[in-house]
């Protein structure tokens, strides 16, 4: 009898075993914290992430033949970007005494300190916790920092609901075993605020398998999630948090009286990918349905349980929930979530168009007080020459005891400001070389983002934060030379394909692919409503102008009205972009044409007809002219 061999069972990834053996995120981290080594082993590093820290190697300081320059990055978990004045002061002090003298606002509304050494790590985390902060769950295979619009409007109740539920969802999905407090605070649990009773009840409520038979971690169990998990809560129309990029996005739905009714639900977003691995990809979230406010915790637990139980624990490159939706399809995913939830989704509610907002400058809160949005280029709070942002911000926080809200575009909002303090606050920033008028900031800089990358991020293959200012400056010079001086384009850059600065949603995305080389993505929208696509696989930085000059010229010639560059690229398509670029000859310096370039004048009427036909047929003007001349001369 011939039998068909059965496939060998798939082996869980190495990290799954590390989590399972960790005793709920304790070991080997707790033991290794006590030794004299200046680093943790690979197994301990995996557990350290759950506690909000990454082990890094400063490659600028690395000496050939010597051991790595080990140091640690610490990241806060603060839903909705809230940083009380007391916490900011403590973080600023830590960065001076035990860090690299800077702070970094993240693209998930947290703060990072870089440069902490291992022997100071316990003290640093304890300092954060004792000053109204936390790092628990800021990293690792767990629900990360829950995002919400940072704007502190007091007269728009939907914003209050977004903040409230960002906090409650974060509490619902916070680890429960107590390992964090045992390791970093010797077992003393410090609580900055009481957990809402409905959150406690929701955590213990077992629907249809949402909870595991595990009293220590009823939602996560001892292996937690297959990979990182990201959630946002926003309000209709406000896309300051990149709504399509999360595992779950909840959209607050209110009635005409401003009372909360429920939430629209999107799921399956995620941007991380790997170069040359086509099975990995960026994905925008899908609308799933609507739930009433009474069902929102059940909904969140049902989606988490679906990913927990069906997400890929064998291949970490395929472990994010976006791949589950891609493999299953939205309908199968929706039905599984409904099975856990015990009831069907209602229909997705109509929404207005999404709009990116950065809230820079001065705004009324709606309660008689003001808030002020401060641009932080690439999120780095630092002092450098005459630019003394770190000093100025500390003076303002100390003098006025203002809380901060960090934005998803790594900027800062100071709020609860008395109107009479506005002039004094502006003066402090201006005296320290900080621009306070958002209209004075180049829009390329204002709307750009970059990840930290080199020298500290272990995944970076090239520069990002340190090179982005010069890239934006070169793009601006090029636009100016082409008589496009006021053009606003969303640019984003990462030093690797993991997508921390969300380059795949930008109009122009630079994704590090090799030293000083970038994959270029085009076609995202100014309001981050769709994914861009890879236009070229590897652009050396020295070829920046030669790549973008023909694209900008084509854009100038063939755009429709005030069409954005990203919308233009999406409309005409990459074939047309490449054809135009291939046939483009740049004018010689000094305004003289190259020998092989000829000019033919057209009447205004003929040019208008040519442009109209180009827009109607979605065809470049030079291609229409070429075809017409070929036909005419061939007679």
Swiss-Prot record:
Record text on cofactor binding: Binds 1 siroheme per subunit. Binds 1 [4Fe-4S] cluster per subunit.
Question: Known catalysed reaction(s)?
Answer: hydrogen sulfide + 6 oxidized [2Fe-2S]-[ferredoxin] + 3 H2O = sulfite + 6 reduced [2Fe-2S]-[ferredoxin] + 7 H(+)
Q: Where does siroheme bind?
A: 500
Q: Does the keyword Iron apply?
A: yes
Q: Which residues form a coiled coil?
A: none
Q: What class of enzyme is it?
A: oxidoreductase
GO-annotated biological processes: sulfate assimilation
Q: Where is this cross-link: 3'-(S-cysteinyl)-tyrosine (Tyr-Cys)?
A: 54-139
Cross-referenced InterPro entries: NiRdtase/SiRdtase_haem-b_fer, Nit/Sulf_reduc_fer-like_dom_sf, NO2/SO3_Rdtase_4Fe4S_dom, NO2/SO3_Rdtase_4Fe4S_prot, NO2/SO3_Rdtase_4Fe4S_sf, NO2/SO3_Rdtase_FeS/sirohaem_BS, SiR_ferredoxin-dep
Cofactor(s) this protein cannot do without: siroheme; [4Fe-4S] cluster
Q: What is its EC number?
A: 1.8.7.1
Which UniProt keywords are present, listed alphabetically?
4Fe-4S, Heme, Iron, Iron-sulfur, Metal-binding, Oxidoreductase, Thioether bond
Q: Which GO terms describe its molecular function?
A: 4 iron, 4 sulfur cluster binding; heme binding; metal ion binding; sulfite reductase (ferredoxin) activity
The residues the record assigns to binding [4Fe-4S] cluster are 451, 457, 496, 500
The cross-references to Pfam families, in alphabetical order and at most eight, read:
NIR_SIR (PF01077), NIR_SIR_ferr (PF03460)
Q: PANTHER family given for it?
A: SULFITE REDUCTASE [NADPH] SUBUNIT BETA, SULFITE REDUCTASE [NADPH] SUBUNIT BETA-RELATED
Its quaternary structure?
Monomer.
> What family is this?
Belongs to the nitrite and sulfite reductase 4Fe-4S domain family.
What is the documented function of this protein? Catalyzes the reduction of sulfite to sulfide, a step in the biosynthesis of sulfur-containing amino acids and cofactors.
What's the protein here called? Sulfite reductase [ferredoxin]
Please give the organism: Synechocystis sp. (strain ATCC 27184 / PCC 6803 / Kazusa)
């Amino acid at each position: 009898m011939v039998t068909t061999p059965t496939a060998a069972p798939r082996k869980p990834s190495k990290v799954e075993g590390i989590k399972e053996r960790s005793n709920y995120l304790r070991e080997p981290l707790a033991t290794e914290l006590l030794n004299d080594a200046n680093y943790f082993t690979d197994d301990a590093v995996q557990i350290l992430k759950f506690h909000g820290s990454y082990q890094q190697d400063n490659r600028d300081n690395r000496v050939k033949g010597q051991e790595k320059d080990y140091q640690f990055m610490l990241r806060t978990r603060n839903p909705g970007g809230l940083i009380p004045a007391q916490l900011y002061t403590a973080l600023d002090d830590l960065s001076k005494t035990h860090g690299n003298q800077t702070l970094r606002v993240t693209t998930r509304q947290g703060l990072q300190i870089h440069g902490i050494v291992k022997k100071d790590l316990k003290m640093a985390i304890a300092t954060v916790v004792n000053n109204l902060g936390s790092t628990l769950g800021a990293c690792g295979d767990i629900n990360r920092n829950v995002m919400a619009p940072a704007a502190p409007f007091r007269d728009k109740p939907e914003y209050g609901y977004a903040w409230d539920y960002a906090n409650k969802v974060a509490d619902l999905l916070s680890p429960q075993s107590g390992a964090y407090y045992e390791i970093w605070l010797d077992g003393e649990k410090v609580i900055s605020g009481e957990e809402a009773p409905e959150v406690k009840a929701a955590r213990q409520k077992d629907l249809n398998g949402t909870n595991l038979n595990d009293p220590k971690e009823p939602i996560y169990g001892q292996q937690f999630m297959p990979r990182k998990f990201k959630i946002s809560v926003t309000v209709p129309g406000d896309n300051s948090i990149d709504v399509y990029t999360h595992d779950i996005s909840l959209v607050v739905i209110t009635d005409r009286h401003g009372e909360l009714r429920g939430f629209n639900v999107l799921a399956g977003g995620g941007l991380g990918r790997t170069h040359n691995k086509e099975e990995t990809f960026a994905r925008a979230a899908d609308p799933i349905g609507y739930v009433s406010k009474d069902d929102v915790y059940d909904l969140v637990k049902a989606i988490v349980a679906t990913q927990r139980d069906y997400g890929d624990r064998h291949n970490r490159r395929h472990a994010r929930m976006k791949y589950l939706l891609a493999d299953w399809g939205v309908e199968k995913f929706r039905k599984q979530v409904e099975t856990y939830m015990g009831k069907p989704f209602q229909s997705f509610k109509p929404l207005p168009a999404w709009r990116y907002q950065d809230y820079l400058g001065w705004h009324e809160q709606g309660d008689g007080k003001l808030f002020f949005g401060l641009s932080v280029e690439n999120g780095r709070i630092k002092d450098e020459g005459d630019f003394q942002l770190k000093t100025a911000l500390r003076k303002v926080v100390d003098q006025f005891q203002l809380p901060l809200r960090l934005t998803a575009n790594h900027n800062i909002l100071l709020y609860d400001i008395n109107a009479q303090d506005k002039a004094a606050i502006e003066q402090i920033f201006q005296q320290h070389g900080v621009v306070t008028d958002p209209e004075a900031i180049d829009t390329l800089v204002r709307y750009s983002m970059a990840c930290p990358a080199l020298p500290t991020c272990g995944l970076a293959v090239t520069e990002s934060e340190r090179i982005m200012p010069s890239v934006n400056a070169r793009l601006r010079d090029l636009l100016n030379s082409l008589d496009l001086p006021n053009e606003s384009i969303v640019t984003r850059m990462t030093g690797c394909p993991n997508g921390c600065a969300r380059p795949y949603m930008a109009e122009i995305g630079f994704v590090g692919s090799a030293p000083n080389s970038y994959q270029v993505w085009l076609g995202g929208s100014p309001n981050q409503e769709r994914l861009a696509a890879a236009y070229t696989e590897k652009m050396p930085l020295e070829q920046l102008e030669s790549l973008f000059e023909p694209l900008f010229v084509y854009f100038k010639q063939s755009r429709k009205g005030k069409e954005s560059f990203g919308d233009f690229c999406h409309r005409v398509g990459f074939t047309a972009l490449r054809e135009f670029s291939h046939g483009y000859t740049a004018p010689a310096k000094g305004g003289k044409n190259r020998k092989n370039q000829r000019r033919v004048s057209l009447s205004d009427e003929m040019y208008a007809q040519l442009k109209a036909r180009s827009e109607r047929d979605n065809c470049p003007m030079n291609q229409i002219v070429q075809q017409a001349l070929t036909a005419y001369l061939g007679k």
